[in-house]
């Protein structure tokens, strides 16, 4: 059986990357929350 996780750097960046987060209002909320929490890495 094929595994569900098939890593791809492009897909990873496009869906979870900084620019992807920045693009939507909810994504910007995610960045805001992570900054408030003091996360070292905001995105992938």
From Swiss-Prot:
Official protein name in the record: Large ribosomal subunit protein bL34
UniProt record similarity statement: Belongs to the bacterial ribosomal protein bL34 family.
InterPro entries named among the record's database cross-references: Ribosomal_bL34 (IPR000271), Ribosomal_bL34_CS (IPR020939)
Superkingdom to which the source organism belongs: Bacteria
Keyword Cytoplasm included in the entry's annotation: no
Entry keyword annotation includes S-adenosyl-L-methionine: no
Molecular function in Gene Ontology: structural constituent of ribosome
GO biological process: translation
Region Disordered, annotated ranges: 1-44
GO-annotated cellular components: ribonucleoprotein complex; ribosome
Organism: Petrotoga mobilis (strain DSM 10674 / SJ95)
Biased composition (Basic residues): 1-38
PANTHER family xrefs: LARGE RIBOSOMAL SUBUNIT PROTEIN BL34M (PTHR14503:SF4), MITOCHONDRIAL RIBOSOMAL PROTEIN 34 FAMILY MEMBER (PTHR14503)
Record key words, sorted: Ribonucleoprotein, Ribosomal protein
Classification via Gene3D superfamilies: 1.10.287.3980
């Amino acid at each position: 059986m094929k595994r569900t996780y098939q890593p791809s750097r492009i897909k990873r960046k496009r869906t979870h990357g900084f620019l992807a987060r920045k693009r939507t209002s909810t994504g910007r909320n995610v960045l805001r929350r992570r900054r408030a929490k003091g996360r070292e890495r905001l995105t992938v």
